[in-house]
Design a protein with these regions (language model features):
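Glycine- and acidic
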Residues: 1, 68-72, 93-99, 178-180, ...
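Intrinsically disordered, low-complexity regulatory segments
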Residues: 1-162, 339, 433-434, 470
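Basic, low-complexity terminal or inter-domain segments flanking catalytic cores
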Residues: 2-3, 79, 90, 173, ...
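Amphipathic alpha-helical transducer elements in NTP-driven molecular machines
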Residues: 9-16, 33-36, 40, 76-87, ...
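C-terminal or mid-to-C-terminal helical accessory/interaction module adjacent to the motor/catalytic core
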Residues: 93, 137-219, 254-258
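Metal- or metallocofactor-binding catalytic centers and their adjacent structured scaffolds
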Residues: 232-265, 271, 547
């Protein structure tokens, strides 16, 4: 008997159907010689700092850095039932070995490792490594299970990535939050990404547009241009000299050019194209692609390869044929030309997973049953697959130079000789319909035939006004491209470059920036908020450096290959934390008030953000924190007292405050006591009292005392 553990229930069901585990049990599927169970994504995660020491429950700068000696993992509260099922199965005497069937990648290794380690199991582990959930792929994968030892370095990289993110996130966020009295979220990857948004926004806001002029000659219908003349008088003089005069062709250059078909999709290029064509966010595209994968309609989406392996040649031909049949391509596509599959095959360019293509399940699928986004993304992948294996786009480009009054004007035109893959690109221009645009409708920039020495008489000259343009704000498309190549110029040519994040994590990074209110979407644009701009301004360069973060990603890749040790990578992360705290020590008191726009009464004991007064309470300014001191809280109301500003400020400062004129209904007397406040990590507040050694007062005693004090004043 063996146990298969997948990442999600849907994947478990697909595997169970193939290996014959059809009997439903509580949290798993049972077969004659196997069991199939599942996680719910990250079933376990690293614990929060207070699990190592209760003092970390409160955010204090002097407690930093927080660096666990022995890392602890805990199960998410809402997933404990499934974990205990897995733990029981992993330690069952019936089970001889375990198959790790979590997603074939870095995160899949981490998900399985956490569960396996927490369970205490010592069962041998094998690895199912597949790029498709088709029955044939699962069956082949199960018949050729790999040793878990093959993926030891991948698991090490997964652990280091997760621990590095924890260390940077926890320490940097607490350091800058407690220094600036405002919740400031800092991340190993998200902060350099934010810095790119802020840099682009600065380039746009600081841009000074300049006016320039083009002078254009009409040479018997051929527009010949002298561009970018910044002096208006010079431009007008040139126009005036040329208008009505003759122009002579001094050079004609005809060049045949070929444009190769785009490569197959990896996740990043799919996300970029879906954003450009459909306006989908990176996360929407990833979620949709994952759904199509689980429905067995496309191959594994979280890939960084744009090639297929050489043993997939016949599969690729069959898939292309199936795409033609499924989408009933008409007109010039009645007979699919033999796809050039060789151009998309390269074993050296495929590591964990090959490029994203449809599966043969496309043949039996019902497209009308798919959700709108699923239908669009499947269509995008299908047509792009055909496009990538199509002929080159070939055109003839003609460049001419025309001399008029001693100045050279240039014109350019082209004639398409072979549409090739561009024919399929028209599908995307017609994105709302599953049809191919007639190529005859495509505009072709033709130029009349001209010869060197040809003269144009009485040409018309026109001056047109233009302005230089600022850089465009990032869209999800261009931001993903920038993240993918960030820091690459710092590396040698032979260095494997990974940029900021990975294809699987970039969508989440963008969403986190928006959730943290450091960035916002405006149509297709992604713009930094004012808080995002200030955060980037206050952080040291190394925390927002794209090249440093890209270097970390490269080191993780080297670790996957077994070329560097985990200790080497983690030492670098810890050294960076030390450097960060040294910089924080030097922050001036005046600088720490940068985010403060109104008077606060103190700092939150839970997260260190500023606390402000409202009509009903004193609340933490961090929207993720639930700490609040209510003016009419039940504890004080029971003693006929309300929380005022002075009391709240003292509690925030010292954790206790001496309170007079508290009333006990039971004993019908007033008394005074020290009010103590305790908080937990959720922001829940508990009050308690301690009593100074003073004589209690009744209501009558209080009245007499007040009268006596009044007399003494006079």
């Amino acid at each position: 008997m063996y146990l298969v553990i997948a990442e999600k229930p849907s994947v478990s069901r697909a595997i169970a159907e193939v290996i014959g585990a059809q009997e439903r049990e509580d949290g798993y599927l049972q077969g004659t010689d196997c069991m199939v169970s599942w996680c719910f994504g990250h079933l376990a995660e690293y614990v929060s700092p207070d699990a190592y020491d209760e003092k970390f429950n409160q955010w204090r700068y002097e407690d930093l850095p927080i660096i666990p000696k022995d890392w602890k993992v805990t199960v998410s509260e809402d997933k404990k039932d499934q974990f205990y099922i897995l733990k029981r199965l992993l330690n069952s005497p019936e089970i001889e070995y375990v198959v790790n069937a979590c997603d074939a990648g870095r995160e899949g290794e981490l998900i399985f490792k956490h569960v396996y380690d927490l369970s205490g199991s010592k069962k041998p582990v094998k690895r199912l490594w597949i790029s498709s959930l088709e029955d044939s792929a699962i069956l082949d994968g199960m018949q050729h299970l790999r040793s878990a030892e093959e993926y030891r370095h991948l698991a090490e990289a997964a652990v280091c990535r997760s621990q590095a993110d924890w260390l940077v996130g926890m320490n940097a966020t607490r350091a800058y939050t407690t220094k600036y009295f405002k919740k400031l979220t800092v991340g190993r990857v998200q902060t350099p990404t934010l810095a790119m948004l802020v840099e682009r926004a600065g380039q746009i806001s600081n841009f000074q547009k300049e006016k320039y002029f083009n002078v254009e000659l009409d040479c018997d219908g051929i527009p010949a241009v002298k561009p970018k003349i910044f002096d208006p008088d010079e431009a007008e003089q040139l126009r005036s000299r040329c208008h009505g005069n003759e122009a002579i062709v001094t050079a004609v250059k005809e060049t045949e050019k070929k444009v190769k078909a785009p490569k197959l999709y990896d996740l990043t290029t799919l996300q970029r194209e879906a954003n450009r064509i459909y306006g989908m966010t990176a996360k929407q595209t990833l979620d949709t692609a994952q759904s199509l994968y689980e429905k067995k309609l496309i191959t594994y989406p979280r890939t960084d390869s744009q090639y297929l392996t050489e043993d997939m040649e016949q599969t690729a031909r069959n898939v292309v044929r199936q795409i033609y049949e499924k989408y009933q391509l008409t007109g010039p596509f009645d007979q699919p030309e033999q796809p050039d599959v060789k151009k998309v095959m390269n074993n050296s360019k495929v590591t964990d997973h090959h490029a994203i293509i449809p599966t043969m399940e496309l043949a039996s699928s019902h497209l009308d049953e798919l959700k709108s986004w699923e239908e669009k993304i499947l269509f995008l992948i299908a047509v792009h697959t055909v496009m990538a294996m199509s002929k080159d786009h070939i055109y003839q480009e003609t460049e001419i130079e025309v001399e008029c009054q001693g100045e050279i004007f240039k014109a350019k035109g082209k004639i398409v000789l072979q549409d090739g893959w561009k024919l399929f690109e028209n599908c995307f221009k017609n994105k709302d319909r599953m049809a191919i645009v007639d190529p005859d409708q495509e505009m072709k920039e033709r130029m009349p035939k001209v010869t060197q020495g040809q003269t144009f008489y009485a040409v018309a000259a026109e001056k047109t006004e233009h302005f230089t343009s600022p850089p465009k704000p990032y869209s999800e498309d261009t931001l993903l491209a920038a993240m993918e190549t960030a820091g690459n110029k710092e590396f040698d040519e032979d260095t494997e470059k990974k940029g900021l994040g990975t294809p699987a994590t970039r969508a989440g990074i963008i969403e986190k920036l928006i959730y943290s209110q450091y960035a916002t979407r405006k149509g297709k644009q992604i713009l930094p908020t004012d808080d995002g701009k200030v955060l980037v301004e206050i952080l040291p360069d190394f925390l927002k450096s794209a090249s440093m973060t890209a270097e970390w990603e490269n080191q993780l890749l080297l670790m996957e290959h077994g070329e560097i040790a985990p200790e080497q990578f983690m030492t670098g992360i810890k050294n960076m934390l030390t450097m960060m705290l040294n910089g924080c020590d030097a922050i001036s008191e005046e600088e720490t008030r940068r985010f403060q726009t109104r008077e606060s009464i103190g700092t939150c004991p839970v997260c260190g953000s500023l606390v402000y007064e409202s009509k009903t309470n004193f609340y933490c300014s961090n929207h993720d924190c639930h700490f609040a001191l209510w003016k009419d809280n039940r504890y004080l109301q029971s003693m006929e007292k309300t929380m005022d500003k002075k009391m709240a400020a003292e509690l925030l400062k010292n954790g206790s405050v001496h309170v007079k004129d508290l009333y006990s209904r039971k004993k019908n007397m007033y008394f005074e006591a020290d009010l103590h406040m305790d908080t937990d990590e959720t922001g829940k507040v508990n009050f308690s009292l301690s009593f100074p050694k003073k004589k209690p007062k009744t209501k009558a005693n209080k009245k007499n005392r007040l009268e006596e004090e009044t007399k003494n004043e006079f």
